[in-house]
Amino acid sequence: MNPPISVFFLTSEVLPVVKTGGLADVSAALPAALSELADEEIDIRVGTVAFRGVESLPGFSLTKTFVARTPAGALTIRIFEGRLGKGNVPVYAVDPEGLFDRHGLYGEDGGEYSDNLERFSLWNHALLHLPAVVGYSPDIIHANDWQTALSIPLFPHVIRPKIQTKPHRSVISIHNMAFQGVYPLSQWHWTGLPPAYNSFDGLEFHGRLSLLKGGIQFADLVTTVSPGYREEVLSEPGGCGLSGALSHRQDRFVGLLNGIDDREWDPASDPFLAVHFSGSNPDPKDLLKERMRKEWGFSQGRRRPLFGVVSRMAHQKGLDLLAETLLSMGEKGDLGGEWVVLGSGDLHLEGLWRTLQALFPDQIHLRIGFDEPLAHRIIGAADFLVVPSVYEPCGLTQMYGMRYGTLPVVNPTGGLRDTVADGKTGIWMEELSENGIKNAIFKARTLYLEGHEIKEMRIRAMAVDSSWKNRAREYIRVYRRLMETPPWHNPLE
């Protein structure tokens, strides 16, 4: 048995407290998977925001109140505690005087709250006081994205001297380089960091401050969510202005694939599916397709592939180019098959897809919004799942598709390239363009109509182990190597 290890996992989103994207899924699944490794003794605890309504969540209750000194002075901090997964992972939802009691987590109506630097900085200060309050001394602080990146320089140089905890290591995981927490230097005081950190070797970023840069500069280890994305962000434009900082940390920068919750996403037991199937018995999947086609009013009698899209409607996801491609294909009378689309986001894109549905009502069915049961049903019923992302740090949808024998049709960027094998478990687009998307759609249709090969590919895709249990072992190995490695040298010392 390896020696025990303790990890304080910091995240702005975790199910069931709050979710705006995939970070919430990762933050729930990875700690749970780590805690359930039978041959490892790991004390992992999650620190997150006390989002509106947390006190009403089953299993969550107010357990502690304390006062923390912050850049805003003395704040009264409330801790709502709950549990995750079979391992009963403690989750601390931290409330710095109601700063997250709002309709949105980051903003409303497509805009960001003007006081986000204040909110997230004060929350980071409160989070880092929490271990001493609950009697917890972590070996590793694992931050995620810009929202918790401030904790990396803050803990050793501001908080630890006050609470005198043991030496620790720090990790910053980057889920998407496009979101960096960039704010005016005039708001620097909210960080609580010494003036020396307001420099090129610190958080200064083109005349502003970048919270994510601070995490990159001072963490003992930087990770991102796939090996392919790691390579892309080491140069521009993938690095979004921070490729230099990442290149400086290359020897302490690794790509670790995300996983999926293979209990929640299991076609053999999924409660949202009317019929269940598996790799050893895949045929009932066809019944789900026919149910969906009838339910959504597709014309009966023709044998055509069903393409699914389950995505945020954003330029990053390539939904604008896909819509333009389908418009062009539709004008020539051939969409390649039938389409079921679920998503929401950019209002212009939502309008574009509504226009497409109006033009081709017999071939495209659209649902605007977030609907978890419907997402399961589409992925269970479709023949192909189209993922035309401009860039994709890791992506989860394609792994859900493979788990359900729904072959991903992807632009091979970042984690899509790492997880989908062209011609074996999915189809790669030759390029991200109208022609590239159209050719991949027609290739998928040919595969479907020929019949034999698609069955083999489905079974092969369903056999791929993308579970968090499998991925968690990689994280354990990284954590243990990190504890054996000297701390990263602070460039400001």
Which residue stretches match the model-derived regions?
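Catalytic cores of nucleotide-sugar-dependent glycosyltransferases that transfer UDP/GDP/TDP-activated
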Residues: M1-E493
